Amino acid sequence: MVKETIPKEGENIKIQSYKHDGNIHRVWSETTILKGTDHVVIGGNDHTLVTESDGRTWITREPAIVYFHSEYWFNVICMFREDGVYYYCNLSSPFVCDDEALKYIDYDLDVKVYPNGKYHLLDEDEYQQHMQQMNYPKDIDVILRRNVDILQQWIEQKKGPFAPDFIKVWRERYKKLRQKS
């Protein structure tokens, strides 16, 4: 049995995403924890090494704040670019944390949000393909579709990680923690 742990502020952790079949999908080598509770983990990273399932690696281009919630089937990456904040939202299982990493299952569907507030649902073809290949249960599909709706409401209502104050508060906290280290 895996013992769940709650990451502490200032701690550096790995983030591991998996596919439904249990195979590793992607690993972010280092994210600094800004807030860790039973329900929410908020972290920050910048120029972080990412390893893909096939072994390829790349480095993130900009500072980002990541948001995970234990009750919702999505996570949000807030990326700070010259022309504004972009959001990349992964439809995924709720997160779990253990001594190794923060972990979740990536379910292919993504929502990209632009600085002007417009957003698009991405990768529906990949989702349909993997749903058949990996035999996603029908109730997973229902949960994910419901969470797409919740995510769209959050975006439109500027709730949670889409709230302007969220960005200000957590970006500042990340900058201060980086200065200390």
UniProtKB/Swiss-Prot annotation:
Q: What is the official name of this protein in its record?
A: Nucleoside triphosphate/diphosphate phosphatase
InterPro entries (alphabetical):
DUF402, FomD-like_sf, Ntdp-like, SA1684
Q: Which GO terms describe its molecular function?
A: magnesium ion binding; nucleoside diphosphate phosphatase activity; ribonucleoside triphosphate phosphatase activity
Highest taxon above the source species: Bacteria
Task: State where Mg(2+) 1 binds.
Answer: 90, 106, 110
Function, in words = Has nucleoside phosphatase activity towards nucleoside triphosphates and nucleoside diphosphates.
User: Could you confirm whether the keyword Zinc appears in this record?
Assistant: no
Per UniProt, where does Mg(2+) 2 bind? 108, 110, 123, 126
Q: Which cofactor does it need?
A: Mg(2+)
Name the lineage. Answer: Bacteria, Bacillati, Bacillota, Bacilli, Bacillales
Provide the reaction this enzyme catalyses: a ribonucleoside 5'-triphosphate + H2O = a ribonucleoside 5'-diphosphate + phosphate + H(+); a ribonucleoside 5'-diphosphate + H2O = a ribonucleoside 5'-phosphate + phosphate + H(+)
Cite the Pfam families for this sequence: DUF402 (PF04167)
Q: What is its EC number?
A: 3.6.1.15, 3.6.1.6
Q: Where is the active site?
A: 26 (proton donor)
Quote the PANTHER family the UniProt record gives.
PTHR39159, UPF0374 PROTEIN YGAC
Q: Give the UniProt family note.
A: Belongs to the Ntdp family.
Keyword Magnesium belongs to the record = yes
Q: Which organism is it from?
A: Staphylococcus carnosus (strain TM300)
